[in-house]
A protein has these predicted regions:
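Cytosolic juxtamembrane N-terminal segment immediately preceding the first transmembrane helix
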Residues: 1-24, 28, 35
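Cytoplasmic helix-loop-helix junction between adjacent transmembrane helices
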Residues: 105-137
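Hydrophobic transmembrane-helix bundles of small-molecule transporters
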Residues: 159-232
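MFS-fold secondary transporters
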Residues: 35, 85-90, 105, 179
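Central cavity-lining transmembrane alpha-helices of secondary-active solute carriers
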Residues: 48-64, 110-117
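Helix-breaking motifs and short loop linkers at transmembrane-helix boundaries and internal kinks
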Residues: 38, 70, 88-97, 108, ...
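Conserved MFS/SLC helix-loop-helix module at the cytosolic interface between two early adjacent transmembrane helices
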Residues: 57-96
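Extracellular/periplasmic helix-loop-helix junction of adjacent transmembrane segments
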Residues: 29-58
Length: 232
């Protein structure tokens, strides 16, 4: 209650920009990571697609997760999950582990971003005019992604690709600190909704289907499509 309403809006906007920096792996530094860990370019592309896959499968369940947890809990879960994924990515060398971490990081990225945008929606447009709201979200997504690319370019130029992961971890830790000290522990944006009835098996199967399709189209040319036993 002691946080001024105007400051609350800008804090949520800042949180949205922060979530655009996240992802356990960034395709902008693919050259460095391919050279250091001896991976294929397709391995890094696949990790980028897995991040998008994680964002996609979050959509059907993010409303239930939002109303299942308090707002502060949602931000903690998203930020801590991203921190763990980024920390593990710096040490693993197996492509399938990198893909899994990228997929999970994408899921948490979308969950945290949704937590930000759904909270300040009425601040942007009290009349719920989505013609006003979506351009603001578009600015956040595109602006955050653009700034992420610039930051990655400078950090990898003066250091190596792990600096970007450390930078993301630092941002998420600052985010957790602000959330801990400036948000109510028991605030929820709507009525409580349990996770009973959520088809988690279907979520897993759709995730496997998406990852399989992305793998086939990413590695198809490398393995010579249908003439390869690996594709079959």
């Amino acid at each position: 209650d002691w946080v001024p309403p105007r400051l609350r809006f800008w804090l949520y906007m800042a949180f949205g920009f922060l979530y655009q920096y996240v992802g356990s792996i960034n395709t902008s530094y693919s050259n460095q990571i391919v050279s250091e860990i001896a991976l294929l370019n397709e391995d890094i592309q696949m990790a980028g697609y897995c991040t998008l896959g994680g964002i996609t499968v979050c959509f059907p369940v993010m409303y239930r997760l939002k109303f299942y947890m308090y707002t502060r809990q949602l931000f903690f879960v998203s930020a801590i999950g991203i921190i763990i994924c980024n920390a593990l990515t710096m040490s693993v060398t197996e492509p399938w582990m990198i893909w899994g971490l990228a997929f999970i990081a994408g899921f948490y990225k979308m969950l945290g971003m949704f937590g930000c945008t759904s909270v300040f929606r009425l601040c942007v447009t009290p009349s719920r005019n989505y013609a006003v709201f979506f351009p603001v979200v578009y600015i956040m997504v595109c602006g955050g992604t653009y700034l992420s690319g610039i930051t990655t370019a400078y950090l990898t130029y003066y250091g190596n690709w792990r600096l970007m992961n450390l930078f993301v971890i630092a941002l998420m830790m600052i985010h957790c600190g602000i959330v801990y000290f400036m948000m109510k522990p028991d605030h929820r944006s709507g009525p409580f909704l349990s996770l009973k009835g959520v088809d988690f098996i279907g979520l897993f199967l759709w995730s496997a289907f998406l990852i399989s399709g992305m793998w086939m189209f990413t590695y198809g040319e490398h393995y010579d499509w249908w003439t390869s036993s690996t594709i079959w």
